[in-house]
UniProtKB/Swiss-Prot annotation:
Signal peptide, first to last residue: 1-19
Protein name: Endolytic peptidoglycan transglycosylase RlpA
Primary gene name: rlpA
Biased composition (Basic and acidic residues): 68-79
Species annotation: Helicobacter pylori (strain ATCC 700392 / 26695)
GO MF annotation, one: lytic endotransglycosylase activity
Amino acid sequence: MGLALEKVCFLGVIFLISACTVKKEGVKNLSYKHESLRAYENAKDYDPTTKKAAYKRNFFERHFKRYSDSQDSNTKDQPLDNGMRDSSSIQRATMRPYQVGGKWYYPTKVDLGEKFDGVASWYGPNFHAKKTSNGEIYNMYAHTAAHKTLPMNTVVKVINVDNNLSTIVRINDRGPFVSDRIIDLSNAAARDIDMVKKGTASVRLIVLGFGGVISTQYEQSFNASSSKILHKEFKVGESEKSVSGGKFSLQMGAFRNQIGAQTLADKLQAENPNYSVKVAFKDDLYKVLVQGFQSEEEARDFMKKYNQNAVLTRE
């Protein structure tokens, strides 16, 4: 009898220990989809229908701990354009070079209509109601996004190239810090292009405007194709043609032959699409100029890679 009782007690203890273990299902598979340093933890187990983390709670959570919805203190009922920070001082601060994981990133010049291709990911509940890189409060129900180098408040159209669905977002954060990702979308934007479940999507970005405003040249297409919610968040107006990305430039070479200068310029432009490369004729020479550096340090990093004897000038 005593031995049988000991057996029952032992099995009971084993059951309690196993019951107390949190079971996060599918983490390995989903972690691949959300490798962004910023987005991975909150996106992997997110269920957009309940707006809660969809994991099995352990024994103590089920019986003694009440689930908290405090992360939804910032909700879709609030104004979605609430808190846009567009002062010139904040804009300048967020255009400075910064370092993440030992790698330097250089916010840079961008032109209206410029296009970028790459992979998008998304981030949601665990960052909801927390501060973004420019000091705004992140609202996952709003159409915003994180980008490593685009100027803050740049407005871009995001097209899912696999299904041709599109949305519009305003850049208000930095990331994703994964080499093959070019943009981290809010949950609302990710749902627009049907990529929440998959986690990532191949996308094309088109710059529509700056300062949170869509340029008038895109007004017709915006009115024709955009949803009501996007019309509440974005307005059409006069927008700059470009946002300057720097005050330094490099003269990478000077040629008597225009063909030689153009060959170098084409090579540098192809390898560095975020900079402006041009050939200027001056003093009987064709000079190859690279523009758009945010700082002297950034320009000197470029020199180390291509030409230590390049001439550094302030624009």
